[in-house]
Amino acid sequence: MKISKGKKLLLLGLALVVIDQIIKIVVKTNMELGQHIYVIGNWFQILFIENEGMAFGMKFGGAVGKFLLSFFRIGLFAALCWWISSLVRKSLDADGKPALLADGSKRVPQGVLIGLTLITAGALGNIIDSLFYGIIFDYAPFMFGKVVDMFYFPIIDTTWPSWVPFVGGNHFLFFAPVFNFADSCVTVGALYLIFFQYKFFARSDESEEKIEKSVK
């Protein structure tokens, strides 16, 4: 049985969410908060922390901010799902085959759909933490759960030379944020779209119509 493009994207998204949640639950149930596990030297560590805010540990204004952030995440997730669904329909012609432009390229490249699916799966992974982890692990009400983070890459941990203006003698750490698999999905998906699929987003519907009419 042939699987439709939409179902393939759904399966990809669900697989990414499952991987994200497995990693988080393993860390949450087997590590103490703040515990380090050194994977490769000092520069790749599993560091169990929880944050109440956005990606990479950024925070957003207390209880009210947390509530608004949860609503924002849900709205963003719904918008992304709608966008992907509309692009899937747009990518197919009346016979269910890939819709092509005059130059032979696909009207909606597969890479665009995959990139958006990565972002959507990452958003859902962190939404699950925010909505349900407080209830599941019995520490907060619905929508006030904390996001589990664990990947830490302090690749450069040093001190600025004293002769460097303004920052001399100060501690320098790169890369400081602690993040999770869902954050990685969002980041990889966004960077992929920016660097490899920018032509699709630069192309307007009006320009598509002109191209299509030129060959009729």
Regions found by a protein language model. Give the residues of each.
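Alpha-helical transmembrane bundles and membrane-interface segments of multipass inner-membrane proteins
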Residues: 1-216
